[in-house]
UniProtKB/Swiss-Prot annotation:
UniProt key word Ribonucleoprotein: no
Annotated InterPro entries: UPF0182
GO CC terms in record: extracellular region; plasma membrane
Stated name of the protein: UPF0182 protein tll1193
Family: Belongs to the UPF0182 family.
UniProt keyword terms in alphabetical order: Cell membrane, Membrane, Transmembrane, Transmembrane helix
One Pfam entry name: UPF0182
Transmembrane segments: 6-26, 53-73, 98-118, 163-183, 186-206, 240-260, 280-300, 324-344, 354-374
Coiled coil: none
HAMAP family: UPF0182
Length: 955
């Protein structure tokens, strides 16, 4: 019989197969690494991504390696101690009764189940982080910790999932048969999963290590805000690792000792010998040390409590839970020290049988009982007996903390609050003095404009207008006009959508070589329409020479947009190879097409055979290797969706849902990118707002959001032709962006480096103001007594759109604020009291120049009745002339659509404007039919805004 040392582990063919699979996997991984590196290098961010990848690899190797080393040491010690032979005489002399068969099965089965639940727990977290790796929650991941309650929750979830239950039962049976094998297998899985969690949590680690200081402190522990934003998440990650490491180590080792010496066959477990007890005591000390760490961290988590009268630590948290958590932490640490001393001290009978440690089981049960009392019974009793009878007095200082820190977390503490006493004295003279406001009142909503664009401006079936963007431009509109005037316009990019190409025309060449880019855009004034009710266009169509058509011609003196090709946009989801031997479709001209070749700097050169091989593997596209259509100067352009592009570079930022197109000529002043460019002329850029967010700002109430801290700290500019991406810091005082600047010093640029022609188009983001306005509904109340009684709750009013009520969204307008010297571009949202329709105030976010980012809250006197949107909608529906006309339209094969109701502040008065669109039942082409204009007393409807204003305010 051959010795085991010469028996092959596997047949040769299987070794070759495994080697081949491993080689293919390594080859694919290497190709992906090279492809991504070339992409980042072309953009100038190779150093940034290599730093990130290095940290991720180091974290994975360190955490997975240390975890496996720990488990491996426990398993080796376990295997050595399992061979201890028990003397029959020693068994007879032992006073320890041990465990009977059923007790042994119960203990072993429970330990098996605990190991499986712990593995499932870590695996679920790793999977969740992988799925959320490009989302905002990835920046501050919420890590559920392993606890008694978590084990119960996961057990219930596993029992209710048939395949999980079946797999778990098989693992339990396997653990009873091969306990050490199960421990080894689960140890490997847990090590890999924890390594993955650490690697995916690289932002948490880097922020914790490179945290910038913040002068602000919270009032309970007096720690810097930086400690909570950066250190607490890092400690939570460390806690997750250590708790699972210790629990699985103790559980797996205990299981191995319980089932040693054929205890199941004998139907009895006689006890642990001294060496086994010392091993288990050391592991128990590790467990209690992690328990001490957990309760130490739970003290800080009281700052995010939801159990009091307001968010954050309340009276019961501070007076009861805080000291008891400290006691629990100290006592657990004391037990850990005693167990560690017991494990390392010498002496005692090495073969004496007994439990792990006398009294440890009873102490653990008592400790769990104390936890139950501390977490539920005692706080509930204190709350009912002491707090509830005098809750306002008890909770008052803590409510004030919540108000202050919530306003800080959502950047509302610098908001300026002003009274707004409505004068209701609008007249023709005042309107003439505010002509810049009235000529920029928005009549066209984005939805009807896009519908019109899709029918009139798409030109071909493969073009799309995915969105329309509101912005302001300085334009010359008349030949004799000396100076430009600020006009609010709607811009929509004409992008190519390959999914809209006819099925018979789809081919590899068309997808990757021909349909490569969109062309042009439309620009419409917001306040007027043509005589037939269709939108008026400043910029439209595509001329025979490729120039966009403009009206009036003076527009060309204000905006440069020659050959506006869009290679990077919101619909560009294909990878392309340009230039190539196959001409690219440039733009349609009548019944024919005009073709072109890309001459920009975007993309990765792909002429060499090895780069073709790399990218054919990367894209899983074998035709790339075989095509004869590539040239020596061909480049591959991929990741062309602008959202994907910026996320790949800075996945730790949260990006706004609405990138917007800017038409500008920054090269007349300086380069858009900090490196030389030889690109062809381009004037189209995408601007994207980026946010730093966290859920760890102390005492800050997140409301309905997954974060309680947000700053619009970064503006991102993407070249629509060359694909260059530049990050500009808008809010340098933000502690989170200062931390990221310390981590990636070459990634960000100061706002002063942004070309002026682009800087003029930065705007306060709608997403941010929506979040802030939602928080302001409750947290505008600065008096804690008023806040506690909910005396002055606000709400976002509703308007009627397409016959359905909807919340009024923040909207842009150009107006002169009561404290302003000139008209400016602002973002406005109105408020009404809860359950009351009258207007109570409005919030304005400023976007121009040095006033960018400043918030102004105008509050109406409570005794003054100011009509809100719902009341104005009711007035429209009740007006006999208007309702009769709308009914007539609806009976004539058409349908009237009420647009957004806008509230326009002009000096100390309010003007209400709502457009009425008309749609035919057949083609659904919306036209502007009427404009309704109102003040506090009168209401008129006319074909144009100018006529309506003249009727409402005659000379």
């Amino acid at each position: 019989m051959p010795s085991l040392s010469v028996v092959p582990l596997m047949p040769p063919w299987l070794r070759w197969l495994c080697g081949l699979v491993l080689a293919i996997a390594l080859g694919v991984g290497l190709c992906r690494l090279i492809a991504e590196s070339l992409w980042f290098h072309q953009l100038g961010y190779l150093e940034v991504v290599w730093q990130r990848w290095s940290v991720q690899a180091l974290l994975f190797l360190a955490v997975a390696g240390v975890s496996q080393l720990f488990y491996g040491c426990q398993q080796q010690w376990l295997l050595r101690q399992r061979t201890v032979t028990l003397d029959p005489a020693l068994r007879a002399q032992s006073t320890y009764r041990g465990l009977g068969l059923w007790q042994l099965l119960l203990c072993a089965g429970s330990l098996n189940w605990l190991l499986i639940v712990a593995t499932y727990h870590i695996g679920a977290i790793a999977l969740q982080l992988w799925q959320q790796r490009s989302e905002m929650t990835f920046n501050s991941p919420l890590l559920p910790q392993l606890s008694v309650w978590r084990v119960a929750e996961l057990s219930l979830q596993m029992v209710q999932t048939p395949w999980l239950l079946g797999l778990s039962l098989v693992a339990v049976i396997l653990g009873l048969w091969l306990p050490v094998g199960l421990f080894q297998g689960l140890g490997i899985l847990l090590s890999l999963a924890m390594g993955a969690i650490a690697s995916l949590s690289w932002p948490v680690v880097l922020k914790g290590l490179f945290a910038a200081s913040d002068p602000h402190t919270e009032p309970l522990f007096r720690h810097s805000i930086s400690f909570y934003l950066f250190q607490i998440p890092l400690w939570e990650l460390l806690r997750l690792w250590l708790v699972n490491l210790s629990v699985v180590g103790l559980g797996g080792t205990t299981l191995g000792y319980l089932l040693a010496n054929e205890s199941l066959s004998h139907g009895k477990f006689l006890g642990f010998v001294r060496s086994q007890r010392r091993h288990l005591q050391g592991l128990s000390a590790f467990v209690f040390a992690t328990v001490a760490l957990s309760f130490w961290l739970e003290r800080y988590k009281l700052l995010y409590s939801t159990k009091g009268a307001a968010f954050g630590a309340g009276y019961t948290d501070v007076t009861v839970r805080l000291p008891l958590y400290g006691w629990l932490s100290a006592s657990a640490f004391g037990v850990a020290c005693l167990l560690a001393w017991s494990a390392i001290r010498r002496g005692g009978e090495q073969r004496r049988l007994g439990p792990i440690a006398p009294g440890l089981f009873g102490f653990t049960l008592g400790y769990l009982g104390v936890i139950l009392i501390v977490d539920w019974l005692l706080p509930t009793a204190i709350e009912a007996a002491i707090v509830q009878p005098n809750q306002l007095q008890r909770e008052l200082p803590y409510i004030q903390r919540t108000i202050t820190h919530t306003r800080e977390g959502f950047n509302l503490e610098k908001m300026r609050v002003e009274p707004f006493q409505p004068e209701n004295n609008l007249n023709a003279e005042i309107l003439a003095a505010n002509a810049a406001t009235t000529r920029n009142i928005r009549l066209w909503d984005t939805r009807p404009l896009l519908e019109t664009n899709r029918q009139l401006q798409q030109l071909r079936s493969y073009y799309r207008f995915p969105a329309a963007f509101l912005d302001r431009y300085s334009l010359k509109l008349a030949p004799d006009q000396d100076q430009s005037e600020i006009r609010q316009v709607l811009i929509a990019a004409r992008e190519v959508d390959y999914s809209a190409v006819q099925q018979f025309a789809r081919s590899w060449i068309n997808e990757h070589l021909v349909f490569t880019h969109g062309y042009g855009f439309t620009m419409s004034p917001v306040n007027t329409a043509e005589a037939n009710g269709l939108p008026k266009y400043f910029v439209r169509d595509i001329g025979d020479t490729g120039q966009l058509l403009v009206n009036p011609p003076q527009i060309r003196e204000s905006i440069s947009f020659f050959y506006p090709r869009i290679y990077y946009g919101e619909l560009t989801n294909t990878y392309i190879f340009v230039p190539s031997e196959v001409p690219e479709l440039d733009f349609p001209r009548g019944t024919e097409n005009v073709y072109n070749h890309y001459d920009g700097t975007g993309g990765v050169p792909i002429a060499s055979w090895w780069r073709r091989l790399v990218y054919s593997v990367y894209f899983r596209d074998w035709q790339l290797l075989l095509t004869p259509n590539l040239r020596p100067d061909s480049r591959v352009l991929f990741r062309r969706l602008i959202q994907d592009r910026v996320r790949a570079i800075a996945p730790f930022l949260r990006f706004d849902s609405e990138p917007y197109l800017v038409v500008a000529d920054p090269r007349s002043e300086q380069e858009i990118a900090p490196r030389p460019s030889t690109a062809g002329v381009n004037y189209l850029y995408w601007m994207i707002d980026a946010y730093t967010v966290s859920r760890y700002y102390p005492y800050s109430d997140p409301g309905e959001h997954s974060f309680n801290y947000i700053r619009n700290s970064v503006k991102v500019v993407v070249d629509a032709y060359n694909g260059d991406v530049t990050f500009y810091v808008v809010e340098p005082e933000d502690v989170m962006i200062r931390t990221w600047q310390r981590i990636f010093p070459t990634l960000f640029h100061p706002l002063s480096a942004m070309p002026h022609q682009l800087y003029r188009h930065i705007r306060y983001p709608i997403d941010l103001l929506q979040v802030q306005s939602e928080q302001l509904l409750k947290y505008h109340m600065s008096d804690p007594v008023v806040f506690y009684n909910r005396e002055d709750l606000w709400q976002i009013p509703k308007e009627i759109y397409r016959e359905k009520p909807q919340a009024v969204a923040p909207y842009y307008l150009i107006t002169k604020l009561p404290i302003g010297a000139t008209e400016e571009f602002i973002l406005l949202v109105p408020f009404t009291p809860v359950n009351r329709p009258n207007l109570i105030g409005w919030l304005a976010a400023r976007s121009d120049g040095e006033n960018y980012g400043k918030l102004l809250l105008y509050v109406f006197p409570k005794q003054e009745l100011v009509f809100g949107p719902e009341q104005m909608e009711a007035r429209i529906n009740q007006d006999p002339v208007i309702s009769q006309q709308i009914s007539l339209w609806n009976r004539q094969g058409s349908r009237s659509v009420q647009g957004n109701l806008l509230i326009i502040p002009i000096q100390r008065s309010l003007l209400y404007v709502e457009p009425i669109y008309l749609e035919a039942d057949q083609n659904r082409l919306p036209t502007l039919a009427r404009v309704i204009v109102m003040d506090n007393q009168r209401i008129v409807m006319a074909p144009t805004l100018e006529e309506a204003l003249k009727q409402l305010f005659p000379q």
